[in-house]
């Protein structure tokens, strides 16, 4: 029979034990729940990429010390230069489901981390530096993580859709094959991205070295997406 876990001080929950651990470690070091969630979300980008990553979005409901609820809707827009004629000129009758010409949107995840972090510093006494919050994820991507059954199953079920997507095979296949459970998965480029965010700040994703690298890759692939379109509103009271 299922039972509820109970805790007096704090509780950290994530779909992967390493994400749970890094969030718990931040709390033990005196961080607040927002800081713990940023660290945990960063780790999810490494260990749980089939569900969320820096290429995704995030949505926050944060309670302040007066129990007021503040919301962050960190969902990026689609490109502003895409319409039906864009696809017709390229010979498409429908929008591709995968690849650089699919219905991609500007990833809002990192922008959401920054807004939540700034809110934490201003309103919740946040004091853990971004360098610490991203460190565990950076190291995990650099040193490698064990492939889980869930990740392997998702790679298997989506292989036919993703195998021709540029970059997929280099990262997620081992000698051209899906890795086995327990195989070490090392993601150097993701580790380097975290390193740049640690060095230059989260905004680097949208206007710095990380931004320029992503835009260069998007241009090479022929994608019309532009990360400079990102504009996430400040935390607001939802009601």
Model-predicted segments: where are they?
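Proteins synthesized as precursors that undergo proteolytic processing into mature forms
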Residues: 1-169, 191-192, 198-202, 206-207, ...
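Hydrophobic transmembrane signal anchors and adjacent membrane-proximal interface regions, especially
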Residues: 4, 178, 228-231
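Glycine-centered loop/turn motifs
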Residues: 169, 176-184
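Single conserved hydrophobic/aromatic residue that forms the stacking wall/gate
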Residues: 230-239
